Amino acid sequence: MKNRLKVLRAERDWSQAELAGHLDVSRQAVNAIETGKHDPSLPLAFKIARLFNMTIEEVFHDEA
């Protein structure tokens, strides 16, 4: 699943560690989601969307 997480994080000038702190996950988890190696759980996807005041669909989209 593709996502805009890296762009959204960069717009706020946050490091991966800072974003991880906001989400209560590890920096490695943020990196795995940003690079598409891992899809977030549904609760985490909602948390990410809320953090950026967006819908899940605005942050994440299917690769198809």
What positions do the PLM features span?
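Recognition helix of helix-turn-helix/homeodomain-like DNA-binding domains
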Residues: 25-38
